[in-house]
């Protein structure tokens, strides 16, 4: 009689649903997954080691490139750790700007997630809808920092600069007539803050569109309900955080439980799931986008009424103004020293965690009193989530593995580092 063996299949790294460079070795009994073994390291760039040879401020752009869909939130964790070691206070206006851009980044991340997740499962329209909205938020990134993705906007002590008074407008081209151009620039006639306000005013209707396409869609529910179930106890034991933990019914959100910046002044709710399956995690993330709108609106209202500095007045950390550099030799020397030698951080260690769109993003920073970190440890939320993939996928079909990878919202920049 023939011996029956399980079949081993390589999923990725060149697979459209592998979310980057994931290689999964699947052990299959027919089409049912018996074991899933994730192989990581294909995007390893030694970020933690590189940071040891760069000044504290030079490592800020490396943070953008970790989870390259949630750029500014990565920076936030890093600058918070530096500020704790330095013992400096951040101006109130800078704190509100940071919270506003954290929520813009959360929406950016969740739009990418809902588009890619739906595309993996087989619904293409949502992907196109989501990227339509992402484009506006990318333009906001570009307006404040000059870059659509890797912004390096947060700095130790505050932010790079205040919100600009004018929003860049679309230019005339061969494919746009005057009427179309006027409509496209309608919301861009005011300041960046006006544009963000306009976006968050119309964004809830966009979320309604995604929900119309997906939430009660029979095929969508068949693909997500009851797939990748994680109990609250196991979610805690496996180190899940963010929507992965809240989807299992545990209301743990660092913005509420361990507030940083001005989150303790914000009025918002923490959505939680009931069943701990892919569908509940989908509902949690969609509701998170609605809560981000609430937080952003509160920040916009405060920023309109209150002016002020956006950088600390500690000149050992803060660079001189551009005007000062062009008129004053001492300011020019100060700027040169600050960006070549950097500032020295007192000896000690600090851990700073932020509520990243994917979970708890933590930075453990050790300083020996020099101008470079002695050790930088990055606590990436996706790392723990990927480790739970084996348990979540067992007993499901190959097609469900795609759904589970999608619901984990995996980006390999932060996992491989």
UniProtKB/Swiss-Prot annotation:
Q: Write out the GO MF terms.
A: NAD binding; NADH:ubiquinone reductase (non-electrogenic) activity; quinone binding
Cellular component terms per the entry's GO annotation: plasma membrane
Source organism's superkingdom?
Bacteria
Its chief place of residence is membrane
Q: How does it sit in the membrane?
A: Peripheral membrane protein
* UniProt keyword list: Cell inner membrane, Cell membrane, Membrane, NAD, Quinone, Translocase, Transport, Ubiquinone
Matching entries from SUPFAM superfamilies are given as: HydB/Nqo4-like (SSF56762)
* Transport is among the record's keywords: yes
Offer one Pfam family short name for this entry.
Answer: Complex1_49kDa
- Reactions this protein catalyses: a quinone + NADH + 5 H(+)(in) = a quinol + NAD(+) + 4 H(+)(out)
Q: What is its EC number?
A: 7.1.1.-
Q: Where in the cell is it found?
A: Cell inner membrane
Enzyme kind, highest EC tier: translocase
Determine if Cell inner membrane is one of this entry's keywords: yes
Q: What does this protein do?
A: NDH-1 shuttles electrons from NADH, via FMN and iron-sulfur (Fe-S) centers, to quinones in the respiratory chain. The immediate electron acceptor for the enzyme in this species is believed to be ubiquinone. Couples the redox reaction to proton translocation (for every two electrons transferred, four hydrogen ions are translocated across the cytoplasmic membrane), and thus conserves the redox energy in a proton gradient.
Q: How does it assemble?
A: NDH-1 is composed of 14 different subunits. Subunits NuoB, C, D, E, F, and G constitute the peripheral sector of the complex.
**UniProt family annotation:** Belongs to the complex I 49 kDa subunit family.
Q: What is this protein called?
A: NADH-quinone oxidoreductase subunit D
Lineage per the UniProt record = Bacteria, Pseudomonadati, Pseudomonadota, Betaproteobacteria, Burkholderiales
């Amino acid at each position: 009689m023939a011996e029956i063996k399980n079949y081993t299949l390589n999923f990725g790294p060149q697979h459209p649903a592998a979310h980057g460079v994931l290689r999964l070795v699947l052990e299959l009994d027919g089409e049912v997954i018996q074991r899933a073994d994730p192989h990581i390291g294909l995007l390893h760039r030694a970020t933690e080691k590189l940071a040891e040879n760069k000044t504290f401020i030079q490592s800020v752009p490396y943070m953008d490139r970790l989870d390259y869909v949630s750029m500014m939130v990565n920076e936030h964790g890093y600058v918070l750790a530096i500020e704790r070691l330095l013992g400096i206070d951040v101006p109130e206006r800078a704190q509100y700007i940071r919270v506003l851009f954290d929520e813009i980044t959360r929406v950016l991340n969740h739009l990418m997630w809902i588009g890619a997740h739906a595309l993996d499962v087989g619904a293409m329209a949502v992907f196109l809808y989501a990227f339509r909205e992402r484009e506006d938020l990318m333009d906001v990134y570009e307006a404040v920092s000059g870059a659509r993705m890797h912004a390096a906007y947060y700095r130790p002590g505050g932010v790079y600069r205040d919100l600009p008074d004018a929003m860049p407008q679309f230019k005339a081209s061969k494919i746009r007539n005057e009427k179309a151009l006027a409509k496209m620039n309608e919301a861009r006639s005011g300041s960046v803050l006006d544009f963000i306000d306009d976006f968050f005013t119309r964004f809830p209707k966009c979320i309604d569109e995604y929900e119309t396409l997906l939430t009660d869609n029979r095929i969508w529910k068949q693909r997500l309900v009851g797939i990748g179930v994680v109990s609250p106890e196991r979610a805690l034991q496996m180190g899940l955080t963010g929507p992965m933990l809240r989807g299992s019914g545990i209301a743990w959100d660092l913005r509420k439980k361990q507030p940083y910046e001005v989150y303790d002044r914000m009025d918002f709710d923490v959505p939680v799931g009931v069943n701990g399956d892919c569908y509940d995690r989908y509902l949690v993330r969609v509701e998170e986008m609605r809560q981000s709108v609430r937080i952003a609106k509160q920040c916009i209202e405060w920023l309109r009424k209150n002016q002020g500095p956006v950088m600390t007045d500690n000149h050992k950390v803060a660079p001189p103004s551009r005007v000062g550099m062009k008129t004053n030799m001492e300011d020019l020397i100060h700027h040169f020293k600050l960006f070549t030698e950097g500032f020295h951080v007192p000896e000690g260690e600090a851990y700073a965690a932020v509520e990243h769109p994917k979970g708890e993003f933590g930075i453990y920073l050790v300083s020996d009193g020099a101008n470079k970190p002695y050790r930088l440890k990055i606590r990436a939320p996706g790392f723990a989530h990927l480790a739970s993939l084996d348990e979540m996928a067992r007993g499901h079909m190959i097609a469900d593995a795609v759904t589970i990878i999608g619901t984990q919202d995996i980006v390999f920049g932060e996992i491989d580092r």
